[in-house]
Amino acid sequence: MPYPHQVVIVIPVYKPFPDPEEIRALRRAVSVFSRHPIRLLGPDDIDYSVYLDAGIDRCSIIQMPGHHFRGIKAYNRLLCSKGFYAIFDVFEYILIFQTDAWVFRDELSEWCERGYDYIGSPWLWRPERVKNSQILDLWPLMKGRVGNGGVSLRKIKVMKKYALLARIFFALTAKNEDFIWLLVSLLPGVRIKKPNADEALKFCIEMEPEEALNRTGSLPFTVHAYMRYGADYWKAYMPD
């Protein structure tokens, strides 16, 4: 079925006063993604003046009840719900682009045209939250797989198709939504088409930037959590 629009960029926010680096990254995203529709998604009980000043159009703000943004658990629950993806039904793809992400150049249409159902940075290095897990070691399930959700391109009809499974896993585990979607993708009979780790690394890098760039040989489309993982390293590749 043809879609009226190929892709929408959704930037989730939860606070009225983002830090200066988040504003810088947001201005960059608005500039680089200028030919694509951008939606700021946030609670209905905050002031958006700072985001408007950063270049977001008031008509591009989608406000939802505040309880969806009160904590990581609430946000994870939202991104496991069919209703969330249904908001964007006129689009084939949704790019989740969190405020701690940076885009180097606009390759969004090209990534959509590759036909994957889900693309995110691969888990090649053990994240801190997994290192510190005292109850259950999730790393064997994650290692080498594609799925980080901070910058992730998702085919909306596929997310809606499997959202009930995601909600069930979330109710059982309350883990991060990107890990929930990984569990769903590993179920027998579930088909969520993803690139391999090397291809996904060209879409987005999160951890170990120097090692990741040595592996890819070129700058990725985006980076996520760059202030946490390699802020000084990435400065050389970002305009002042």
PLM features per residue range, with description:
Residues 1-27:
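N-proximal low-complexity "stem/linker" segments adjacent to membrane-targeting elements
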Residues 17-20, 45-51, 108:
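Short, charged/polar "capping" segments at the starts of alpha-helices
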Residues 25-36:
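Short, acidic, metal-binding catalytic loop of nucleotide-sugar glycosyltransferases
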Residues 38, 99-100, 155:
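Generic structural signal for small/hydrophobic residues in well-ordered secondary structure
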Residues 41-92:
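Active-site-proximal specificity loops/subdomain of glycosyltransferases
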Residues 91-103:
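Short beta-strand-to-loop acidic/aromatic patch adjacent to the donor-nucleotide binding site
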Residues 102-137:
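Conserved donor-nucleotide/metal-binding helix-loop-beta segment in metal-dependent transferases, i.e.
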Residues 144-240:
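Catalytic core and acceptor-binding pocket of nucleotide-sugar-dependent glycosyltransferases
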